[in-house]
Amino acid sequence: MKQYLDFLKWVLEKGKHKENRTSVDTISAFGYQMRFDLSKGFPLVTTKKTNFSAIAHELLWFIKGDTNIKYLVDNKVNIWNQWPYESYKKSQDFQSESLKEFIQKIKDDNEFAQKHGNLGPVYGKQWRDFLGIDQLKKVIEQIKNNPNSRRLIVSSWNPSEIDTMLLPPCHTLFQFYVNDNKLSCHLYQRSADAFLGIPFNIASYALLTFLLAQETNLEVGDFVHSIGDAHIYVNHLEQVKTQLKRNPKELPKLIIKNKNIFEINFEDIELVDYEFDPIIKGEVAV
C-alpha cells in the first residue's frame, strides 16, 4: 500500500531521535493521517508478509470483551505475550520460567492462565464494559437506528483504569460515519509503532469496519487513520529501509460468511488473493 510506504518515508524524513519508556530509542514525528478506500480492496500490507490470522483473532478477542491472552496463545497468536510475562516475573509465583515455559503454562493450566494471563481492563473490556456501558453494542444500534448521528464513537481510553492496564491503549478512539449507504471509520491512535504495529492496526480497524458494515446492511466506505506519536524504533531502521525498496502489490479481498458480529468465528472470515513479499522480522519493544 502506497499510503503506508509514504507514512514510513514521512517518519524517516520528519522524525527526530527520541527516548521513551522502553529500552530502545525511536525516530519520532507527530501528527499524520492516512485514508484507505475499502471498496478497492482490503488494506493489508503487501510489501512484507503480514499475519492476517493474528489480526483477525485479536479483533475477535476484542469483540468478545476478553482481556486474557489464553484465547490468543491457544490460537497461536503471540503478540501480547511479553506484557503478562513481565508482570509475572515480578510476582511471588515466578520460578525463573522462560517466556516459552510461561506461555506453555498459560495453555495447559486454566487456573494459572486466569491468574497470570490477564492484561487488565484493556481494549475488550472498554469496548464491551466501559463503566457498565457496552459501547460496541450501543454504537451498532446507533448506526442502525440513527445513522446520521455524530456520536458514533467508541473509546478505549478510560482514565480511571489506565493504571491497572499492563499496556494502556495505543489506538484510543474510533468514530463511524454513514453516507450514501456506506460505513466509514476514523481511528485516532496516540502511539504508533510504524514498522510492527501500524500494519496490524490498519487491517484490524478495516476488518472491524467490514464486520460492522455487514451487520448494519451497509457498504464499506473509507478507513481514516490519524496518528499522534508516530515512531520507528532504531532497531527497525534497516527493516524499514528494506521495505521501502519494495513495490506494493494488488490488495486482497475479504469474504465474511456470518452476519452477526457477536457470533462470528475466525472460520467465518476469509482472505483471498493475498500476494506479498517475504516476511521482515523485528523485535517488539516492551
UniProtKB/Swiss-Prot annotation:
Residues annotated for dUMP binding in this entry = R21, R150, R151, R190, S191, A192, D193, N201, H231, I232, Y233
- Specify which residues bind (6R)-5,10-methylene-5,6,7,8-tetrahydrofolate according to the UniProt entry for this protein: N51, D193, A285
Q: What is its EC number?
A: 2.1.1.45
Q: Which Pfam families match?
A: Thymidylat_synt
The positions flagged as active site in the entry are C170
Q: In which pathway does it act?
A: Pyrimidine metabolism; dTTP biosynthesis
The reaction(s) this protein catalyses: dUMP + (6R)-5,10-methylene-5,6,7,8-tetrahydrofolate = 7,8-dihydrofolate + dTMP
Do the record's keywords include Cytoplasm? yes
Q: Where in the cell is it found?
A: Cytoplasm
Q: Supply the alphabetized keyword list.
A: Cytoplasm, Methyltransferase, Nucleotide biosynthesis, Transferase
**SUPFAM superfamilies recorded:** Thymidylate synthase/dCMP hydroxymethylase (SSF55831)
Q: Name one GO biological process term.
A: dTTP biosynthetic process
Q: Which NCBIfam families match?
A: PRK01827.1-2, thym_sym
Q: Which PANTHER family match?
A: THYMIDYLATE SYNTHASE (PTHR11548:SF9), THYMIDYLATE SYNTHASE 1 (PTHR11548)
Protein family according to the UniProt entry? Belongs to the thymidylate synthase family. Bacterial-type ThyA subfamily.
Q: What is this protein called?
A: Thymidylate synthase
